[in-house]
Amino acid sequence: KALLANGLTEAGCMAHARRKFFDLHSQKQSLIAGEALDYFGKLYGVEREVVELDADERRRIRGAKARPIADELHAWLTRQRQVVPNGSGTARAIDYSLKRWGALTHYLSDGQVPIDNNWIENQIRPIALGRKNWLFAGSLRAGKRAAAIMSLVQSAKLNGHQPLAYLKNVLTRLPTQPASRVGELLPHRWQPQIPA
């Protein structure tokens, strides 16, 4: 909340909202959840259309195609919430979306914001999966080093590098790299070369 007070804008994850209804539908075959999934499917259908477009065009098309669907979904959720029992799984799923509606639909007015954060969650999944294994890194300093290395490895992957080749090359070059040029070894600037 402090960050939001300092001018940051919250962007919600539509996949998290959708997942509440997906789980409800798969576990209880809820008709309401099934109908909600249809709305989410339409929103993601628009995203498939705009994924390769620049941010301005993406925002324009979202406004024309996805905004009416989102408005219809919001009105439908509000109506459904009036008839479902408090405390039910359906009520919880609806409340989750309605409580976060502004954040969930922020992507409609900003073409640079994705509909969900699945991409970033997939990037940090290796860290989350290894978390229990790394509980015993030996010390706080060792844990910080492991975090720095994991960050470098993921950044190298995101920049299209083979992590092992990147690390071997950087660690070989690092002792002779001038401090003023160490930034050249960061994954987004790195060019493979054999040290002199």
Segment roles from a protein language model:
Residues 1-196:
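Catalytic center-proximal scaffold of phosphoryl-transfer enzymes
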